[in-house]
Amino acid sequence: MRQRTIVCPLIQNEGHYLLCKMAADRGVFPGQWALSGGGVEPVERIEEALRREIREELGEKLILTHIAPWSFRDDTRVKTYPDGRQETIYMIYLIFDCVSANRDVTINEEFDDYAWVKAEDLKNYDLNAATRVTLSQKGLL
């Protein structure tokens, strides 16, 4: 089984949290709402990976004013590829508290949509299992 270290930013702006809706045809949680994030590449430093993933998935214009390590956990997940193949992966999640100066997001092809959501409204979204655990641990659900 392959192992991946995943960096996940929990991005907040003026009391709203950024959620991204995963593309329906790929990923570990197709069609569900999630935090952005992705895998650390070989010899890449953790914060470099976090900033790269944010740029790739959310665009160059989103400005983070605060990044702090918050929590970690592990899990085993099944990833579905665009061609329908599936792979079981051991995931190590490194979760960061982030604050953004703006809400200027441009999503890539990994996502179908995004939303800035008030804490009290997070429960109304079809959150994937990993995001639900993260937001519960944070006291937001």
UniProtKB/Swiss-Prot annotation:
Its Enzyme Commission number(s) read 3.6.1.9, 3.6.1.12, 3.6.1.-, 3.6.1.23
One Pfam family this chain carries? Answer: NUDIX
Question: Cystine bridges: which residues?
Answer: none
The cofactor named in the record is:
Mg(2+)
Q: Which GO terms describe its molecular function?
A: dCTP diphosphatase activity; dTTP diphosphatase activity; dUTP diphosphatase activity; magnesium ion binding
Motif Nudix box — list its residue ranges: 38-59
The record's SUPFAM superfamilies line, in alphabetical order, gives: Nudix
Which NCBIfam families did the record assign?
PRK15472.1
Database matches in PANTHER family: GDP-MANNOSE MANNOSYL HYDROLASE (PTHR43046), MUTT_NUDIX FAMILY PROTEIN (PTHR43046:SF14)
The UniProt entry, under HAMAP family, shows: Nudix_NudI (MF_01846)
Sum up the protein's function in the record's words: Catalyzes the hydrolysis of nucleoside triphosphates, with a preference for pyrimidine deoxynucleoside triphosphates (dUTP, dTTP and dCTP).
Q: What is this protein called?
A: Nucleoside triphosphatase NudI
> Which organism does this sequence originate in?
Klebsiella pneumoniae (strain 342)
